[in-house]
Amino acid sequence: MAIINMSDLDLQGKRVLIREDLNVPVSNGVVTSDARLRASLPTIELALAKGAAVMVMSHLGRPTEGEYNSEFSMQPVVDYLAKALSCPVRLATDYLDGVEVAVGEVVVFENVRFNKGEKKNDEALSKKMAALCDVYVMDAFGTAHRAEASTNGVGLYAPIACAGPLLAQELDALGKALDNPARPLVAIVGGSKVSTKLTVLESLSGIVDQLVVGGGIANTFIAAAGHNVGKSLYEADLIDEAKRLVANAQSRGGDIPVPTDVVVAGEFSPTAAATLKAVSDVGDSDMIFDIGPDSAEALAKIIESAGTIVWNGPVGVFEFDQFGEGTKRIAHAIADSKAFSIAGGGDTLAAVDKYGIADKVSYISTGGGAFLEFLEGKELPAVAMLKKRGA
């Protein structure tokens, strides 16, 4: 079941409709973080270089579906692309019944969520979108886990549906990390709650050699090991689940190591005083906000010997510097490792930026929810659609 790649197609004179993930933060009509826009430029430029008439669509924010709201307009994205691309770029507000687009220009459709039926993957809407193009390109990994009209339905009805370079790259990198990884395979999963990442932890505990947990998730594992976690965020109802995951990992010769030392404070604030304690010495009024240096060093050693590293989530409240040393040590260990490394998820990318290691990570995933669902072993709806159309 091969997926068709846009880079292999002849697009000369073709009407090409590209679904990108251009959902960027906007303040006072100006894009404030352009990472996703920069990531999409090579795909748009390739379509132009191949002689296509290019149309681009995306959602932006969470407007009420079916209603225009200037706060969520794509205009700031159009302004950005007009500066970044050496061709005319314009916004199309009413496009579903047809749009004029010339070879060598880019027409950006207004926010797809202004269309009623977008999120429900409405068939009539999908067919209208499909009728606008000769070739549909799905390039938005960040929304590949959602079956919506602009990410899924349109691809079922377009004359040709293919993967854009960004999506293809993403699937290649994730496949390399999970389908046939160089061992040992080490996964680092952070975040505040076990419940939100339970299926990821279950899926990974069955394939990785070492599963490292951090953040609030680690607190539940610390409690499962019989230690006091004081007033820390943890999930008492998932302690048995945590014990089962540890037993599962150990039965395969792996492990989920619990921190031996932690950094605690009496309150959650940027000015809270940090205190280093052995994990067995956590008091009733303590809150755990980071792993200690001994634990960080032990994890760094695990990372140093890895063949493949998957990183999703920090191991402490790194936004506050006094609770950031654990995440910083792990970030630098990943940067120094010779392993194939992949990082994904919003907080993880913020940590990658903060510690300046972007160029030392083998692949940085653009997807949050999609990255997690891939780690869970789920087939993403957009990928299933592309496989179906490539068959």
Curated annotation (Swiss-Prot):
The keyword Cytoplasm is annotated on this UniProt entry: yes
Pathway: Carbohydrate degradation; glycolysis; pyruvate from D-glyceraldehyde 3-phosphate: step 2/5
GO biological process, one term: glycolytic process
Annotated compartments: Cytoplasm
Binding sites annotated in the UniProt record for ATP: 197, 319, 345-348
Main localization of the protein described in the UniProt heading: cytoplasm
Gene Ontology molecular function, alphabetical: ADP binding; ATP binding; phosphoglycerate kinase activity
GO cellular component: cytosol
Binding of substrate, residues: 21-23, 36, 59-62, 113, 146
Keywords (A to Z) from UniProt: ATP-binding, Cytoplasm, Glycolysis, Kinase, Nucleotide-binding, Transferase
EC number: 2.7.2.3
PROSITE patterns attached to this UniProt entry: PGLYCERATE_KINASE
Assembly behavior: Monomer.
Entry's family note: Belongs to the phosphoglycerate kinase family.
Protein name per its UniProtKB record: Phosphoglycerate kinase
Organism of origin: Shewanella oneidensis (strain ATCC 700550 / JCM 31522 / CIP 106686 / LMG 19005 / NCIMB 14063 / MR-1)
Gene it is expressed from: pgk
